[in-house]
Amino acid sequence: IEILLGGDDGSLAFVPNNFTVASGEKITFKNNAGFPHNVVFDEDEIPSGVDSGKISMNEEDLLBAPGZVYZVZLTZKGSYSFYCSPHQGAGMVGKVTVN
């Protein structure tokens, strides 16, 4: 599944921002708009036992250019909340459910 970082209208959002994947399915987060974005999973909002550091980008790392991607595969079933650290305050957050 491909998730866009930034809406076509310039909004600071994940598109879609709520989605479901199968365990082990590849999730591709793709910079859509050229603003610097990243993908960080909230350590308090993921299944217990999952290491957020192993599935998140470093808070200092950013996808700067349109078309740059970050890929992750989640295997533990449950719900995972994530955000873009530069734009979390603007509401750039999302949730994925792994079945």
UniProtKB/Swiss-Prot annotation:
Entry-linked SUPFAM superfamilies: Cupredoxins
UniProt: Cu cation binding residues: 37, 84, 87, 92
rRNA processing recorded as keyword: no
Record Pfam families: Copper-bind
Protein's cellular compartments: Plastid, Chloroplast thylakoid membrane
Membrane topology: Peripheral membrane protein
Classification via InterPro entries: BlueCu_1 (IPR000923), BlueCu_1_BS (IPR028871), Copper_blue_Plastocyanin (IPR001235), Cupredoxin (IPR008972), Plastocyanin (IPR002387)
Superkingdom of origin organism: Eukaryota
Cofactor needs: Cu(2+)
GO CC, any one term: chloroplast thylakoid membrane
Domain Plastocyanin-like, residue spans: 1-99
Gene3D superfamilies xrefs: Cupredoxins - blue copper proteins (2.60.40.420)
Presence of keyword Cell wall biogenesis/degradation: no
Keywords: Chloroplast, Copper, Electron transport, Membrane, Metal-binding, Plastid, Thylakoid, Transport
Broad class of where this protein is predominantly found: plastid
One Gene Ontology MF term: electron transfer activity
Main function: Participates in electron transfer between P700 and the cytochrome b6-f complex in photosystem I.
Family: Belongs to the plastocyanin family.
Name used for this protein in its record: Plastocyanin
Organism: Cucumis sativus
Gene giving rise to this polypeptide: PETE
